[in-house]
């Protein structure tokens, strides 16, 4: 049985304008992952999120759950997949974390780098491009990708 990834990129534009603690600094959905990434290569899922990690990557963002401050759009989309009974591995990662990752780091065999399985030249490239642009506009800590698996 295959594992599919779904999710959304969110941003918090008010945080840069008014500060992260302002009541108007809430998360907004930006774009559905489905529109940017048409693949579910397991090596990429392993190195990013620890899903099907037969490769021995040190995941960047494993098992963090659904953010408590997720946007209403994200909560609605997540619920449409059945929520916790029907999905697993829910997690999130900020653009700041993606940008700071060691993309030369390899799996346990030393044969696959993060860049080769989930870098700019893979199906993840469009996701990173959108997050990069939103990070330039709103700040790297105020852009995140929230994903779940089914």
Language model feature labels by segment:
Residues 143-145:
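Conserved GNAT acetyl-CoA-binding A-motif
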Residues 1-139, 149-150:
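Acidic (Asp/Glu-rich) sequence patches and key acidic residues
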């Amino acid at each position: 049985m295959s594992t599919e990834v779904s999710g959304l990129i969110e941003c918090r534009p008010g945080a840069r304008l008014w500060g992260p603690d302002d009541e108007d600094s809430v998360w907004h959905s930006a774009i559905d992952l489905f529109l940017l990434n048409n693949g579910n290569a397991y090596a990429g899922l392993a190195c990013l999120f620890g899903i099907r990690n037969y490769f021995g990557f040190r995941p960047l963002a494993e098992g963090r759950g659904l953010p408590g401050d997720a946007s209403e759009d994200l909560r609605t989309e997540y619920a449409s997949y059945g929520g916790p009974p029907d999905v697993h591995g829910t997690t999130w990662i900020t653009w700041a974390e993606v940008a700071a990752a060691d993309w030369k780091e390899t799996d346990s065999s030393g044969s696959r780098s993060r860049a080769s399985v989930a870098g700019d030249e893979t199906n993840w490239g469009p996701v990173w491009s959108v997050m990069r642009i939103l990070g330039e506009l709103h700040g790297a800590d105020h852009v995140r990708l929230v994903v779940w698996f089914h």
